[in-house]
């Protein structure tokens, strides 16, 4: 009886502040995000914090032409899906907090022989305190597993942050490129309208037959359809960017540039990209934590394989009786040990499940490392190739088409080249410029993919299963 309070006191311990703080674990997420992409993120939990973010977002977007960096910053502050991901960190911290808290003892009091007037209303009274010994024995293992899941939640939040940043940057690139395409097609349409009007006038004078007229009219009609489709694509691309930034209402009054920046002459350094990816990829860190969680779950399962419930019940019984005409109270201490007998369930099935879960996590980690190496190599190859292609269109094809048009204009002034030949040369130059714009878009998308290949958040990242380990172990403006 005297040892019971000592046992309960030994189980008690201080819960780490890391789990109990309102922003538990978020500082690590913010720091890692800043290192990877140089942007700030926030976890808003109060109305005042949300209002402060809204004011900052409005100042960044309303009536402004936003850059890619601004779009990414707005998304990291304002996307509610990302805020939900940050809440997972708090949930895992609360789980770890719960595991660090000792199980409450159960107190029971019973009164026997109620109504015995000669004994003062009752015959006996029992008081019992039950403490779960197995919970105390496995507490360190459960805390270790909960801590792994907490760190995995942090890593997943970083991965979600990088994924949103990469998606937003790609959406901005696509939106700007779409409006740039509209601009080129509008210029081509002006040239086409002139050709169609000339064909009509020549047809009226008999200088151009119906086949020639129809050819110019068909080209003009086809270009009108392409321009309408390009405008629709631009509207959709901007709407996707709006969704990722979490904007609505008055915040929609933002613009994107009319064209992407020129392709840089030199590429940034990508030396040792495989090693950099293996050192920095967040999804690989998540896979490692998955394996660590399964190892902790395996150890917990092993500790509880034969005895899954063990309780110590201690108490005292006070019984009244009348002897020689006098009431006498006799107190008797009691001690019980309660546990399940492993006759049918010997825990082998749970051990097998834990072993296979660990093997599964190990294979997932190994394959993830292979995939990351491949993604890094592919991203580097795409980055270099798209840069060469974009430079080819800009430095070779577009100047050649411009030369053809200039020479055609000189010939036209000398009455050697016909008007239709001059219009055709202008169309070809605009077509080359449109190809160059598309190649420029592909380069900037490849550059965004390169960052994702090094730090994470790209299409190759997959969701983690570490959170299941604890449960498995226990059971027209633009």
Where are these regions (language model features)?
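Small/polar, glycine/serine/threonine/aspartate-rich low-complexity segments that form flexible
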Residues: 54-64, 108-138, 142, 255-267, ...
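A glycine-/polar-enriched beta->alpha junction
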Residues: 77-84, 90-105, 118, 127-145, ...
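Membrane-embedded beta-strand positions in outer-membrane beta-barrel channels/transporters
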Residues: 72, 126-128, 172, 274, ...
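Short segments within alpha-helical structural elements
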Residues: 222-250, 398-459
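Alpha-helical heptad-repeat coiled-coil segments that mediate oligomerization/polymerization in large
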Residues: 206-209, 372, 379, 415-419
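Periplasmic alpha-helical coiled-coil/stalk elements that build and connect Gram-negative outer-membrane
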Residues: 138-139, 148, 155-276, 379-382, ...
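Terminal intrinsically disordered/low-complexity segments used for targeting and assembly
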Residues: 1-74, 231-276, 451-478
